[in-house]
C-alpha cells in the first residue's frame, strides 16, 4: 500500500501538468490490483464542457509515454483514462455552482435524501427544487454526498 501511495504521489503532479496544458482537470487517480492485474485509473474533467473520447485518448497517450520513460510501475499494468460520467459525484461547492439547473441526488448528514434540480447556490449554500416545486436550502456542510442524476 505504501508503494502505491508513493507512485500516486510521484504521478499526480505530472498528470496535473499534462491536464492543465490541455485545459483539463484531475478528478481522481487510483492504482489498485483488480483480478490479479494492476489498474491505474485516471479520471479527468473539463471544467467548461464534457470530456470527449479524443481528450481521453490524448491524455492516455501522454501519461503512457511518461510512465514508459519514468519506469514508475515495475510490473505490467492497465491504464484507464475516463471522465466522471453523466452521474458524476458532486464533491466540492464549485461542482454545485457548475451544475445549477441540473438534476441531482443529495444525501444530507441528517439522513435525508433529496432529488431535484439544483436551483441556486451561494458561497456556502445550495438550494434544490423538488419535483413538487418545494425549494429546500441547506449549507454545504450539511451534505454527506451528492451526485448528478441522469434526466431522461
UniProtKB/Swiss-Prot annotation:
Gene Ontology CC annotation, any one: cytosol
GO biological process, one term: ribosomal small subunit assembly
UniProt record similarity statement: Belongs to the RimP family.
Function: Required for maturation of 30S ribosomal subunits.
Keyword Oxidoreductase found: no
Keywords (A to Z) from UniProt: Cytoplasm, Ribosome biogenesis
Record's protein name: Ribosome maturation factor RimP
Keyword Ribonucleoprotein: no
Originating species: Pseudothermotoga lettingae (strain ATCC BAA-301 / DSM 14385 / NBRC 107922 / TMO) (Thermotoga lettingae)
Amino acid at each position: 500500500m505504501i508503494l502505491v501511495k508513493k507512485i500516486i504521489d510521484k504521478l499526480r503532479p505530472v498528470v496535473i501538468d499534462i491536464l492543465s496544458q490541455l485545459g483539463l482537470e484531475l478528478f481522481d487517480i487510483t492504482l489498485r490490483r483488480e483480478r490479479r492485474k494492476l489498474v491505474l485509473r485516471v479520471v479527468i474533467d473539463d471544467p467548461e464542457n464534457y470530456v470527449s473520447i479524443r481528450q481521453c485518448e490524448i491524455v492516455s497517450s501522454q501519461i503512457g509515454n511518461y510512465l514508459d520513460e519514468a519506469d514508475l510501475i515495475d510490473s505490467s499494468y492497465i491504464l484507464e483514462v475516463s471522465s466522471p460520467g453523466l452521474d458524476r459525484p458532486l464533491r466540492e461547492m464549485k461542482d454545485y455552482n457548475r451544475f445549477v439547473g441540473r438534476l441531482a441526488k443529495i444525501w444530507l448528514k441528517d439522513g435525508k435524501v433529496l432529488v431535484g434540480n439544483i436551483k441556486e447556490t451561494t458561497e456556502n449554500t445550495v438550494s434544490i427544487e423538488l419535483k413538487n416545486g418545494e425549494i429546500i436550502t441547506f449549507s454545504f456542510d450539511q451534505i454527506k454526498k451528492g451526485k448528478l442524476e441522469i434526466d431522461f
